[in-house]
């Protein structure tokens, strides 16, 4: 079996999205999980203007666009069993659209509690439960839950919450990720540095909390890895990386597999630079965890993850001209979608003929959007390098 680092190194750009009337940062990418004969594969992209664009994957042409106006959208996720696409909104709702229909109004609206501002969310693997994380308001930072199923007895398009967890985070809940195969397991990350694992099949919040891990810094990304997805990885807004093994919770073995306060200081990039982390990539067939990072000039780095540390393996270049903010790996055809601050969506495929195009420079972005998308900062890193 070809290793993922070999697949990654063999990627070439086959398609670049056409320009849009309003260029935006591309902050998140997800692809439709359903494949239907005679129908295009869909890609959903979260944009910094608060909208979600739906693309045809092969042509990278915009099919339609959904807006959260007057709120801003955070996160994008396709359902696992249909072409519904979800996003959390700062107006206190999670919205659901039919990605194949150009209808402005959501087909479902999941309402939060008064004063909720949602900045993260996920839907579980059987599409039954949605969980969204809030900004801290007064002393409350919540995880709010809904039943996502359509009920033939209740045709209402608006749903109220099933309930909420309110005791386990003390600051903004920046990340929510359900387990890939267990619909009752969910992990949340926060600006308070805590990463909490819950079994939502248990009635009350205190008993549902399986374990708490501490990244000591604001969480920017979390995910599941390992055989049976019994491990959790975490990245922080100051480019830290943490990796925990839940198999060791009831043993004498350490739960922490890896703890790196600043990846930029420890990974040997040879002549290249590493400016930020983008996300993680667990390859189930080879049981390997990889970390994706990049440079402010648009290079994309693949690093292997082991208990001994992170190792730079290979890089992609010639695509983006600015910071890369999002990616989505397709295990079916080993293709890669990337998006960033140059407003371009790129499709990479293995062994393809390289497509040439003109790079776009990074765009200016409004300070309000800068704050919302939590732009990674090099300031602390530069200060430490001077010391």
From Swiss-Prot:
GO BP term (any one): ventricular system development
WD repeat coordinates: 21-65, 68-107, 112-156, 168-208, 214-254, 319-358
Repeat recorded as keyword: yes
Keywords: Repeat, WD repeat
InterPro entries attached to this UniProt entry: WD40/YVTN_repeat-like_dom_sf, WD40_repeat_dom_sf, WD40_rpt, WDR89
Pfam families: WD40
Protein name: WD repeat-containing protein 89
Organism of provenance: Pongo abelii (Sumatran orangutan)
Taxonomic lineage from the root: Eukaryota, Metazoa, Chordata, Craniata, Vertebrata
Gene: WDR89
